């Protein structure tokens, strides 16, 4: 509501994305257009999904995507084609034998195995998803990180320097913070 435009919401899994989509679609279907990424999308389906961001619209488009998936990296939606990314979770990979071997390898060398096996790959997915919003120096957009772990020093140290001007707020203050951001952007222009 703070700013109409195109947004992507990135989830750590298809299951969580589907669960949130069902709730969101039931509550917001009348106030915005909603898209959802599907597993095994064919090329023409991917193209049709991205073409939705090229359309001129009066309202808001909200696209549900999987972090680290086909829309989380390698797509260029410049200018006002994408004005916001909402990132749910820290992108940590699932625990697996491969991840445990990697973690143990770095732990045995006196390094943080958790960082190398989990935190760094997860943050790479987060940064890739966030990077869909700002593609040129003229682009402006909002990036919402929805996970309290982002407040930890270990995660904050991995943020790009451009993120130094950031706000931390709870859900009750979110609308006000996002409105303030867009008001500041309009004043810049």
Task: Give residue spans per PLM region.
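ASCE RecA-like P-loop NTPase motor cores
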Residues: 1-189
């Amino acid at each position: 509501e703070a700013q109409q435009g195109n947004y992507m919401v990135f989830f750590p899994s298809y299951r969580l994305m589907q669960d949130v989509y069902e709730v969101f679609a039931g509550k917001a279907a009348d106030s915005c257009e909603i898209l959802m990424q599907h597993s095994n999308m064919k090329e023409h389906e991917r193209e049709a999904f991205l073409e939705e961001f090229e359309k001129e619209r009066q309202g808001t488009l909200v696209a549900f995507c999987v972090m680290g998936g086909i829309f989380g990296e390698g797509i260029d939606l410049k200018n006002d084609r994408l004005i916001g990314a909402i990132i749910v979770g820290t992108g940590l990979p699932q625990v697996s034998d491969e991840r445990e071997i990697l973690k143990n390898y770095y732990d045995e060398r006196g390094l943080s195995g958790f960082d190398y096996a989990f935190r760094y790959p997860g943050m790479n997915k987060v940064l890739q998803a966030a990077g869909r919003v700002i593609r040129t120096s003229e682009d402006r957009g909002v990036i919402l990180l929805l996970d309290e772990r982002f407040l930890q020093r270990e995660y904050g140290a991995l943020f790009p320097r451009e993120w130094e001007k950031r706000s931390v707020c709870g859900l009750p203050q979110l609308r006000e913070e996002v409105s303030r951001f867009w008001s500041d952007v309009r004043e810049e222009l």
